């Protein structure tokens, strides 16, 4: 008695969390307008990459500087998408700094 429910899973990644949240809201709003059920955006753990370099060129090993790069992630599930939903999502214009992975 299992239904054949279709699901679109969208993972968003970005360094800027404000652009990421705006993109997620655009996707959710577009999917809801076209008649699909939306679950999310779910915030996934932020990935933090720390890079340590020496400030001096030759010696002074104790003098170091650290830089970090944070990758923010969100997950959106679109349940029972209609062809209108898929078409609307394809035409959606999102910022350049946001990486999108779509799985059907």
Curated annotation (Swiss-Prot):
PROSITE patterns: RIBOSOMAL_S10. Coiled coil: none annotated. GO terms for biological process: translation. It comes from the Bacteria. The keyword Ribosomal protein applies. GO terms for cellular component: ribonucleoprotein complex; ribosome. Part of the 30S ribosomal subunit. This is Small ribosomal subunit protein uS10. It comes from Alkaliphilus oremlandii (strain OhILAs) (Clostridium oremlandii (strain OhILAs)). The gene is rpsJ.
């Amino acid at each position: 008695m299992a239904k054949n429910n279709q699901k679109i899973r969208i993972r968003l990644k970005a360094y800027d969390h404000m652009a990421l949240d705006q993109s997620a809201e655009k996707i959710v709003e577009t999917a809801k307008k076209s008649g699909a059920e939306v679950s999310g955006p779910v915030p996934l753990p932020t990935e933090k990459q720390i890079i340590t370099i020496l400030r001096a060129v030759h010696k002074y090993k104790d003098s170091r500087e650290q830089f970090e790069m944070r990758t923010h992630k969100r997950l959106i599930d679109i349940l029972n998408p209609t062809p209108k939903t898929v078409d609307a999502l394809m035409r959606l214009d999102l910022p350049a700094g946001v990486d999108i992975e779509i799985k059907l």
